[in-house]
Amino acid sequence: MLNVMVKRKGLTRLLYATYYSLKGLRAAFLSEAAVRQEVFTMLILIPVTFLLEVTSIERILLIMSLLIVLITELLNTAVEKLCDHVSTDIHLLIGRAKDIGSAAVFISLVLACFTWLTILW
């Protein structure tokens, strides 16, 4: 029995891609406390950017810094889920992969803090 993937095109492909993207975002939100914390932080801070007396470019930078944190967290979550699927045993390389993903999230958080402090200072 062959498992053939159907290649969708045009608007259908876009609709399916959007569906699966939202499905992934929902799965990450429901399974990861860090994703929930970052989404709630964004829900508070993004409206705050419109109350601040900053330029449009600064507002975009503030919002982008928050989105980078969420994007990095989503990628880290994907790496962790894949690692857990491969093996739940303690393994040096799986531990390194998870640590590297965590480091990426940490760097994105530092970047966001630096961006907010620099613009608001």
Regions found by a protein language model. Give the residues of each.
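Hydrophobic alpha-helical transmembrane segments
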Residues: M1-A78, V86, I90-K98, S102-W121
